[in-house]
Every structure is written in structure tokens, then in C-alpha cells.
Amino acid sequence: MTIDSGFNHITVLLDEAVEALALRADGCYLDGTFGRGGHSRLILSKLGPQGRLLGFDKDPQAIATGQALAAEDGRFVIVQRSFAELGAEVAERGLHGKVSGVLLDLGVSSPQLDDPERGFSFLNDGPLDMRMNPGQGISAAEFIATAPVEEIARVFKEYGEERFAGRMARAVVERREKQPFTRTADLAEVLKVANPAWEKGKNPATRAFQGLRIHVNNELGDLEAGLEAALDALEVGGRLAVISFHSLEDRIVKLFMRKLVKGEADNLPRNLPVQHKVFEPKIKLIGKAQFASEAELKANPRSRSAVMRVAEKLR
């Protein structure tokens, strides 16, 4: 567990993820989602003097934590970029095709969720922001204030998997015409009233808030770009480990890996003359999908939805 600004963050699948990378003492590794550094610190503890670790994050608080770690350990560097830009960073550093392993731990961190000022939570009132990097892009409040009702409904349904998306979006637009939304509790209350069928044990604003967060941060677009960039960055034999926290993320990861296990021929027209290697898989899967253990679930209930998939680059 690491502690940051009074908020606890327990790294999910800590040992399992680092073990999945099959670390070499002199290898070069990328932590695409540094967060509060749980995975990075364990990786560094297992690297030798020649080993290197490059961390990525969009969150300014995560960057501050990473800079402190970099000052302590010269083998580590942190950059304030999305892992979707991993390819550009790797190319700038001359590391293309030389990376031994990439770790992506997706979603929002506990410090982000638990700090009301970040605007991610419907349980604790705060400014309606939701941006991983508050200095980049539009906030959730700006989106809610300007988007057409159809776009708001699409975000709730497509990214939040909210079945009452249309009804909830109409309630949001009706209310914003009288008074703009600036606080999370205000939006959560309108969503709560508009949701006619509450799920047992789940706040009625949960899915809509998830949809907003994913949209504001382009999380699924970043994931698709980041997976491609990570594979390109890896050396042959390098490993990619991805931890996802909801079905939309896991579906993208699963389909990406499944496509590469089959090779590229599935995407080509029939009877097209091709070289034999397009039938060869680009990756192999390492074991089955992994989930949090019973012990981890007891220690950290937020790990219940975590699933990790691991692949090794073949060519």
C-alpha cells in the first residue's frame, strides 16, 4: 500500500503482474500507468544496475510521485504522457523494438476516486471535472453543458452500459437549461431521480458516471492505440501484461490478443496471394486470464473486477 495526500492506494495484482513480465535484470520495461508507483517500485527492486524502467501517467499527482522516485533511483524515468503516446516516446528514446516488457493497469486509481476535488466520485461532492490531467481537454461539466441530448445518451449507453441512458440524458438536458451542472453531487442526484430501476447494492449514477469518465479521458481510444504501440515497442520475447477493470476494457484487450494469436490472414480477402508469415501468430498467450485471489479481495474489495491478460511477442 502506498499513501498519497491522505488517500490510500492498494496496487491490484501487484505480485502477479510483475511476475507475468518475466523480468530480466538488465531489461528495459515500461509502466504505462504509473499511478502511485506500486508496480514500478516492485519492478525496480528486481532489476539490476543495468535495468531501466520508463513510467507514463497523465495525472499531475502521479507525476509528482514519479519524479520523487526518479530522484531516488537513476534507473527510472517518468513522463507526463498517455500510454497511447508510448510509441512516440519510445521512438524518441531509440527504444523501438528493444523493450522487454510493458505493463498497463487501466482505469481510475483510488486516490483519484477518493479525492472529491478530482470530480470522479458520485459519493463525495466535488467539482464536476473527471479529467486524469486537469490541464488537458474538456471537463465533464463542459461536456454536460454543451453536448446534444443524443450525444450524452450515447456516452451513457456506449461507455457506461446504462440501459436508461436516453431517459437520464433528457433529465440532464432539462435541468441544465435552468441551471448548469458544476458539482458531482448535483449531477448524481438528477441521475438518481431519472433512473427508474436501481440495481441492488449499486448507486443509480454509477454507470452514467463511468460513461462520462471514459468519454472525457478517451480511455477506450487510448487503450486501442496503446495496445498497438506496446506491441510495436516490444522486442521478440517481450511481454505485455494488461489489467482491466470493466467489460469494455477487457473486451478490447481480449479481441486484440485473439486477433494476433490467429495471425493476420483472417483480415485479408480470400484467394489473395500472401507470404506464409502472415498466417503465423504475432503473439502467444501466457496462461489464462488472472483474477484477484480471495486474500486480495478481502484486503481490497475494489480488486473484485480486475482481470489480467498476458501475451508474449513472437515476431
Swiss-Prot record:
GO biological process: rRNA base methylation
Family classification: Belongs to the methyltransferase superfamily. RsmH family.
Keyword Transferase annotated: yes
Keywords of the record: Cytoplasm, Methyltransferase, rRNA processing, S-adenosyl-L-methionine, Transferase
Gene field: rsmH
Subcellular location: Cytoplasm
Enzyme Commission number(s) from the entry: 2.1.1.199
Binding site for S-adenosyl-L-methionine: 37-39, 57, 83, 105, 112
Gene Ontology cellular component annotations, sorted alphabetically: cytoplasm
Role description: Specifically methylates the N4 position of cytidine in position 1402 (C1402) of 16S rRNA.
Protein name: Ribosomal RNA small subunit methyltransferase H
